[in-house]
Every structure is written in C-alpha cells, then in structure tokens.
Amino acid sequence: MRDPRDIIKRPVITERSMEMMAEKKYTFDVDVKSNKTEVKDALEAIFGVKVEKVNIMNYKPKAKRVGRHAGFTSRRRKAIVKLTADSKEIEIFQGV
C-alpha cells in the first residue's frame, strides 16, 4: 500500500469549496493514479475522520504558450469528499 500522504497532495481552497464545507464536503487535489477507495483510506488515516462518499474529477492538460514556446499544463485529479454526519471536521480548513 502507498503512503497516504502520497495520495492526498493538497487541499483546494476556492470560494465554491468553502461554501461546500458547510455540508461537510472537502476538496483535495489527489494523485492521478489513485482511486476512490485509496482516497477514502488516506483521508481516514491522515485526519482521523469518517468518509461517507468520494467523488473524483479528472482534468485534462491544457495547451499553454510562453512566447514562442508551447507546452501543456499538468493533468490533475480532484476529489470531493463528503464526511459522515457524526464525523469531526478537518482542522486544516479551520483558519481559512
């Protein structure tokens, strides 16, 4: 099994993700090779919470240019995690 901190990369802090926190939904960037079960197990191991549901979205790379040099952004994978009603909140989002 992989280390849980390799699966969960960073929290996503946007206006929409902050509004979803009232419904106990938290948003994270995750490893592109991870699946829903790995994301659930990693969050339960790192933060000690109970996960009810995991939704995952894939973002394709976008073409970008800097002057005459063209390239692509990195592909991303984002997970929206819903906690159970009796679960505690994730502390990483408290001061934001």
From Swiss-Prot:
Which is one Gene Ontology cellular component term of this protein?
A: ribonucleoprotein complex
Biological-process GO terms, alphabetical: translation
Q: Which domain of life is it from?
A: Bacteria
Q: Does the keyword Signal apply?
A: no
InterPro entries the UniProt entry points to: Nucleotide-bd_a/b_plait_sf, Ribosomal_uL23-like, Ribosomal_uL23/eL15/eS24_sf, Ribosomal_uL23_CS
Cross-referenced NCBIfam families: PRK05738.2-4
The uppermost taxa in this organism's lineage are:
Bacteria, Bacillati, Bacillota, Bacilli, Bacillales
Record keyword Ribosomal protein present? yes
| Gene Ontology MF, one | rRNA binding
Q: Which PANTHER family match?
A: 60S RIBOSOMAL PROTEIN L23A
Q: What does this protein do?
A: One of the early assembly proteins it binds 23S rRNA. One of the proteins that surrounds the polypeptide exit tunnel on the outside of the ribosome. Forms the main docking site for trigger factor binding to the ribosome.
Subunit (UniProt)? Part of the 50S ribosomal subunit. Contacts protein L29, and trigger factor when it is bound to the ribosome.
What protein family is recorded?
A: Belongs to the universal ribosomal protein uL23 family.
Query: Could you identify this protein by its name?
Result: Large ribosomal subunit protein uL23
The UniProt keywords, alphabetically, are: Ribonucleoprotein, Ribosomal protein, RNA-binding, rRNA-binding
- Species whose genome carries this gene: Bacillus anthracis
List the Gene3D superfamilies. Answer: 3.30.70.330
